[in-house]
Structures are given as C-alpha cells and as structure tokens.
Amino acid sequence: ITDSLGNFAIGVPPGFYLVKWEKYGYIPFEMGNYALSTDTTLQNVTLLPGFVQDVCGNVSGVWPSGSVYHVLCNITVPQGDTLTIENGVTVKFVAGTGMVCNGTLNVLGNDSSKVLFTSKEPTPLPGDWDNVELYGFMNNINHLIYEYATDGFTGSNAIGSTFDNVYMVGNLSL
C-alpha cells in the first residue's frame, strides 16, 4: 500500500536482503545482498514495460527486442533451426545452465542496444552459469555482453560464423 506519491514504508530488522520490485506487465528489478539498516532509503526504480519468459529445452524463432528470458535448464537450438535474438534482449541463465547451438544463432545487438547474456543471480559472480556451445554453421553474434559464465563460447565446426563487438566480462575463462 503506497501513499499518494507511490511511496511506502516498512519496518524490517537490520540485515542483508534480496530487494525486488515487481508489477504485472513490467520487467522485475532485483538487488541482492542489499544491506538495510535504520532509516535506509532505497533508490528510485523505474520498471520497464514487458514480460519475462521462462525457457527450457529446445528453442528457436525470434526473441523480440527489449524482452527478458530466464533460462531455467539447458537450452538447445536444434540442427536445422535458427534462434534470432534481437537488440536489447536480456538472457539470464540459472546456475549451471547454458546453451548448445546445433543450428544457427543470430544475436542482433547494436551500438545503442546490446544483447546481454548474464547470470540470473541477484548478486552475480564469475562462473554462475555454464557457457554457449556452437556446433552449427553461419552464426552471427553482434554487440553482445557475455558475463559471469564459466567459459566463453566453445564448440567446433562453426564454419562461417562471425563475431563483432562481443564483450566478455567477469567470466572464469575465455
């Protein structure tokens, strides 16, 4: 319950908390291991319209711009299929999960709206999720931020694949 300005107050004992803002029809925002003490004022948060899609198993098709995907188990792009991830998409991997691409992966980020592959953990650490394995032909990876994985891209036979402006951040190894 909020006041007329949308503010509210709640009493909690001092400690470390997962703080999460959610509203139906909007992408949630989380802060993990956030220290709350007496009279803590939290930052203002603006939730962006959109939905979070949980994925697991075989995937293909188009993941539209600005959406968020939670990878709950290993995902696979089957041979002969294509997964196209448009600019501004965030893909959050649960611990120990990853992607195997036997088909084609197109990551279509751009200068102003990159694609993000990251950990789903509220306080991410290197090695939180596995990696992306490429075995299909003609993958196209553009303007991707790839963070907190165990490894960078692995695989073989990814003939004709291109990588342009891929930023590896906070991974255990390349």
Over which residues does each language-model region extend?
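Hydrophobic loop/turn residues within beta-sheet-rich immunoglobulin-like superfamily modules
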Residues: 11-15, 34
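Surface-exposed loop/edge segments in extracytoplasmic proteins
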Residues: 1, 27-32
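Short strand-edge motifs at loop-to-beta-strand transitions and within beta-strands
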Residues: 8-10, 29, 41-43
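Short, acidic Ser/Thr/Gly-rich low-complexity loop/linker segments typical of extracellular
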Residues: 1-11
